[in-house]
Amino acid sequence: MSILYALVARGTVVLAELSTTSTNASTIAKQILEKIPGNGDSHVSYSQDRYVFHVKRTDGLTVLCMADEDAGRRIPFSFLEDIHQRFVRTYGRAIHSAQAYAMNDEFSRVLNQQIEYYSNDPNADTISRIKGEMNQVRDVMIENIDNILDRGERLELLVDKTANMQGNTFRFRKQTRRFNNTVWWRNCKLTLLLILVLLVIIYIGVAFACHGPTLPSCV
């Protein structure tokens, strides 16, 4: 699974979050929220080990996710843009005064649904390319997390690799099933075509023997 963790926060106040595996990403994400420089809008990524924390902040609302480094940047930032729009559309002005985790019970289900989509559905990346969204992602520099955390604050990122492998296995099975379905339909079409050709050949032979296409001497 490409995306393993996500949160939505106002400043350092976490409003909703979800982790798809056993990890301490939440603790590290909260450290990042406290250390993000400046007050303006930003798109930034921080790497740690084989994982990258991607951050999008717009109008004081921060959306963050942790993904495998091989997920690249387009899919994670497309995910963040999607989550930002859904969150603002759902809660509006309530965002500015909500208490910590006020939206967690409801919106964590949305996070789970969209993480599943952006991690496993190949259409997610295709749609992002067609829309031409997130052009600014090209300019996002991936920094090491040590650049914003003091040496004494840095925590080792712990990820349950068993759960991660299960996600990869699920994706492989899904792709295999899709491939098998494609092959099955192709074989069905080929079989139908051969049957049609065979029927045409039989008809031509019968029509020739019966002296005409309406089979006058055989009817």
UniProtKB/Swiss-Prot annotation:
Per UniProt, subcellular location reads as: Vacuole membrane; Prevacuolar compartment membrane
- Record topology, Vesicular segments: 211-219
Organ and tissue specificity: Expressed in flowers, leaves, stems and roots.
Which chain regions cross the lipid bilayer?
Answer: 190-210
InterPro entries named in the record: Longin-like_dom_sf, Longin_dom, Synaptobrevin-like, Synaptobrevin-like_transport, V_SNARE_CC
Q: Longin domain: which residues?
A: 7-111
Q: How does it sit in the membrane?
A: Single-pass type IV membrane protein
Q: For this UniProt entry, what's an example GO CC term?
A: vacuolar membrane
**Annotated v-SNARE coiled-coil homology domain residues:** 126-186
Q: Which UniProt keywords apply?
A: Coiled coil, Membrane, Protein transport, Transmembrane, Transmembrane helix, Transport, Vacuole
* Domain remark in the UniProt entry: The longin domain is critical for the vacuolar localization.
Any idea what this protein is called? Vesicle-associated membrane protein 712
Origin species: Arabidopsis thaliana
Gene name of the encoded protein: VAMP712
